[in-house]
Amino acid sequence: MVKRQFDYEQKVQEIREKLEELNNLSSNMEFDLSQEIESLEEKIENNRERRYKNLSPWEKVLLSRHPERPNSNDYIRYFCEEWIELHGDRHFGDDSSVIGGIGRFNGQAVTILGYRKGKDTRENLQYNFGMPHPEGYRKIQRLLLQAEKFQRPVITLIDTPGAYPGIGAEERGQAWAISQVLMTLSALEVPVIAVVSGEGGSGGALALAVADRLLMLSNAVFSVASPEACASILWKELERVEDMARAMKITANDLQRLGIVDEIIEEPLGGAHLNFPEMAEKLKKALQKHLGEILSQDSGELLEERFQKLRKIGEFRG
């Protein structure tokens, strides 16, 4: 049976509740079990630390999909002193699974683009589970060109299972829309920093990942397709999804070793959702550092370095 949810924290919470009951019981019956309870709590924390430092790639996939994981909305609200969301692709409509606009980050006007997942059923339906349509990618391209025109740096936040694979999306040119974003980002004459904050799936994620710097949260994943899709296609066995997650090299550590990711932002113990302020502050400081480093570069130097960075990806080293 393939595990579909990372439920370790739930089990820890259940044990803590039992300990709390035991503590109350000992108080009522005048037994002093405080030392034993304290010792057990210390063991729980030590076990948690070991557990989270040794997560398998598949467990990181599950953690990256956690329904309470911070989304692009959360980070934008934390980062920006001012924020104006912009809508529409000026061709077909407005895709709510893509959030984009102008913000003031650390006193600097920036364009921020990201994918938007929901935290409950209503929001997931509204945002199409974070899967953009072609109009979403056209909105991204429009705002990228606007950022270049007004010389605003671009920050992208990536958390999507992939582009929406529906018939309507294909009829409206899904692949073409993604390719236009890739082409635009490759030649954009302003600094671009991309952050894989959760699930980075397929071409949908790749569309916002062409950047001067690529940052990744420690429990995020980034891959050409989901492990489930690869297991179904290559092995015809969904049960081998954990083997596929391992083989695909989709974790932040794997991708940094391969030279794709520039920096890993360590998440709080248990995941970004358990301590959002700490996670957001770490990411904010990393963005400030990288933005400060590349803002001083002229556009020609920036484009050349971006080109060389992209050319090295997938290069065979014998």
UniProtKB/Swiss-Prot annotation:
Q: Which domain of life is it from?
A: Bacteria
State the taxonomy lineage: Bacteria, Bacillati, Bacillota, Clostridia, Eubacteriales
- Protein purpose: Component of the acetyl coenzyme A carboxylase (ACC) complex. First, biotin carboxylase catalyzes the carboxylation of biotin on its carrier protein (BCCP) and then the CO(2) group is transferred by the carboxyltransferase to acetyl-CoA to form malonyl-CoA.
One term of GO molecular function:
acetyl-CoA carboxylase activity
Where does it mainly reside? cytoplasm
Quaternary structure and partners: Acetyl-CoA carboxylase is a heterohexamer composed of biotin carboxyl carrier protein (AccB), biotin carboxylase (AccC) and two subunits each of ACCase subunit alpha (AccA) and ACCase subunit beta (AccD).
List the record's Gene Ontology CC terms alphabetically.
Answer: acetyl-CoA carboxylase complex
Against PANTHER family, the record matches this protein to: ACETYL-COENZYME A CARBOXYLASE CARBOXYL TRANSFERASE SUBUNIT ALPHA (PTHR42853), ACETYL-COENZYME A CARBOXYLASE CARBOXYL TRANSFERASE SUBUNIT ALPHA, CHLOROPLASTIC (PTHR42853:SF3)
Positions of the CoA carboxyltransferase C-terminal domain:
32-293
Q: What is this protein called?
A: Acetyl-coenzyme A carboxylase carboxyl transferase subunit alpha
What reaction(s) does this enzyme catalyze? N(6)-carboxybiotinyl-L-lysyl-[protein] + acetyl-CoA = N(6)-biotinyl-L-lysyl-[protein] + malonyl-CoA
A GO BP entry: malonyl-CoA biosynthetic process
HAMAP family per the UniProt record, alphabetical: AcetylCoA_CT_alpha
What is the annotated localization of this protein? Cytoplasm
Q: What is its EC number?
A: 2.1.3.15
Family to which the UniProt record says this protein belongs = Belongs to the AccA family.
Its keywords, alphabetically, are: ATP-binding, Cytoplasm, Fatty acid biosynthesis, Fatty acid metabolism, Lipid biosynthesis, Lipid metabolism, Nucleotide-binding, Transferase
Pathway involvement of the protein, from the record: Lipid metabolism; malonyl-CoA biosynthesis; malonyl-CoA from acetyl-CoA: step 1/1
